[in-house]
Amino acid sequence: MDNYEFSELLKTLKNKVGNIASIIKPENIQTRLKEIEELENSPSFWSDVKQAGIIGKEKTKITNLLKNYENAFNALNDASELFDLANSENDTETLEALFNDAPKLEDTITSLEISMLLSGENDGKNAIVSIHPGAGGTESNDWASILYRMYLRFCEREGFKVETLDFQEGEEAGLKDVSFLVKGENAYGYLKAENGIHRLVRTSPFDSAGRRHTSFSSVMVSPELDDDIEIEIEEKDIRIDYYRASGAGGQHVNKTESAVRITHFPTGIVVQCQNDRSQHKNKATAFKMLKSRLYELELMKQQDSANTGEKSEIGWGHQIRSYVLFPYQQVKDNRSGEAFSQVDNILDGDIKKMIEGVLIALKAE
């Protein structure tokens, strides 16, 4: 990097921070934080625990947003002032240090962008994630299990907690279906970027001839809804099936019909839960999963998305991302256009940077 390139980078980053400031309005955030502080000092504030909780979450979110803005603004100003000073004094050592720190400065601005992009109504909520293998039997089942592990490792890296709601093992390998709840700040905000079809190209470990195979899995992500959000489900529109739990689940497996499956006829959505020993609890969780999926579907309709939320046949033309392990190694996201060669790291859950690239690209559309 030279003086001209760094100068151009500063201009780009200043424009970016200026645009963000015009959207988030830092002065309005400061005013709102003062209002919340006054509310918290009111004796009656804590009498409504539910409302206090809602305001508490708002305070945390906008405090973090303001902090990220101030960090970015100050870092950019400091770098700009130091650059001007070093230039005027022809201080090559300081200039070299600034050039070396340029990626760190860009990361600071990216953190601000992401905190702004995750300020939506549902972004701070927990996420319900379902993975369904496409046609292809063992090969696709194995790919679904690889994706499942990738998300578990991502959640571990981010400090998110995971609760498995439904897990159905594949007959030979992998899994037939899995649904899990991810708990943590902005869990849905991040994982919503994973909604879609994921394509894998590799030499199959299940093919004795060592031929190249292409597999698909569908990932569906919806926000876990608060209890106060009303989603009307008519009894005539659903069928509830009870069956014996299978797979890893403890001593109660295959002894009682504790597992619950709900089919919603108007949309074709099917949810199932076998997480608990209690049929009653599994039924309540399955209804919660269904409501979240219906809510996500309605959001997509409101956004005039071409995808109505019902995944078409899992196959060509619908994937959001391709993972190529053979004949070369690359993961490419179709929405951001970004390609990554560190395939092993990505499959081990190092997907945050890739997700952030998607969030920024989708916002720019």
Curated annotation (Swiss-Prot):
GO molecular function: translation release factor activity, codon specific
Top-level taxon in the UniProt lineage: Bacteria
Keywords annotated in UniProt: Cytoplasm, Methylation, Protein biosynthesis
One Pfam family of this chain: PCRF
SMART domains in alphabetical order: PCRF (SM00937)
Listed InterPro entries: PCRF, Pep_chain_release_fac_I, Pep_chain_release_fac_I_sf, PrfB
Major location category of this protein: cytoplasm
Modification(s) after translation: Methylated by PrmC. Methylation increases the termination efficiency of RF2.
Chain positions with N5-methylglutamine modification: Q251
Cytoplasm listed as a keyword: yes
Subcellular location per the Swiss-Prot or TrEMBL entry: Cytoplasm
Cellular component annotations (GO), alphabetically ordered: cytoplasm
Gene3D superfamilies, per the entry: 3.30.160.20, 3.30.70.1660, Release factor
Family to which the UniProt record says this protein belongs: Belongs to the prokaryotic/mitochondrial release factor family.
Function: Peptide chain release factor 2 directs the termination of translation in response to the peptide chain termination codons UGA and UAA.
HAMAP family, A to Z: Rel_fac_2
Classification via PANTHER family: CLASS I PEPTIDE CHAIN RELEASE FACTOR, PEPTIDE CHAIN RELEASE FACTOR 2
Protein name in the entry: Peptide chain release factor 2
Organism of provenance: Campylobacter jejuni subsp. jejuni serotype O:2 (strain ATCC 700819 / NCTC 11168)
Encoding gene, per UniProt annotation: prfB
